Amino acid sequence: MPAASAEAPSKIVALGDSLTAGFGLPDQEGFVPRLQAALADGGIAVEIANAGVSGDTAADGLARLDWSVPPGTDAVIVELGANDMLRGIDPKATRDALDAILRRLTQRHIAVLLCGMRAAPNLGAEYGQAFEGIYPELAEKYGALFYPFFLDGSAGDRSLTQHDGLHPNAAGVGVIVGRILPKVKELLTRAGSQHPS
C-alpha cells in the first residue's frame, strides 16, 4: 500500500449555533479552527466541518441534520440549545429535537459528543432544572459522550466574553478549547472503534 494512502484524517462535524460558528470573531479564532489546530498540535490529524449557524435552535439543527452531517462523517459534536433557552422555548420541544438528532446519528453509527448548556437564572429554577436535565438524560439514553457545559471556564468572565456578554472572545475560545480537548480526544478514540479500518 503506498504511503500516500495511509490512514485518512478523521472527519468531525461540529453541529451548533453561534458558539460553534465563531460569531464576532476572525475566521481563524472561532471554536472549530482553534480546536482543529489544538488537535494538530498534539499530532492528531482531523478535519472538522463548521456546521454552526448563528441563531439556530435545536429544532433548526434537526431540520438541517442530514445535509450538515454528510456520509463519511466519523463523529459529531452537538452544541445546541442556547438559543432555545434565550427564547424561553419549552424544554420539552428542545429535548424532542435533540433526542431526534442523537437517534439519527446513533442509527448511522456516528460517535457523538453532546455539549450541555446552562439556563439563565432569570428563567427560574423550574425551567433551569428541566432545561439543564435534558443533556445528561439524552447522553445516557444514547450512550453519547457528555460535556456538561460548553462555555465552562468562560461564562460570566468579562475578560473572556464579547461586549454582548454572551459570546466568548478569542481568549474565551482558547479556554473553551483547552477544557473540552480531552473529551474530543475521547470522541475520536470512540469514533475509531466504531469505524474499524
Name what the model sees in each region.
Residues 24, 49-57, 86-89, 165:
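Acidic/histidine-rich helix-loop elements
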Residues 21, 57, 121:
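Flexible, glycine-rich phosphate/dinucleotide-binding loops
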Residues 2-54, 64-73:
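Serine-esterase "nucleophile elbow" of acetyl-processing enzymes
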Residues 16-17, 55, 81, 169:
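Conserved G/P- and acidic residue-centered "switch" motifs that form tight phosphate/ATP-binding loops
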Residues 1-9, 190-197:
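Short, low-complexity, intrinsically disordered N-terminal peptides in bacterial proteins
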Residues 40, 44, 60-197:
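Alpha-helical cap/lid subdomain in secreted, periplasmic
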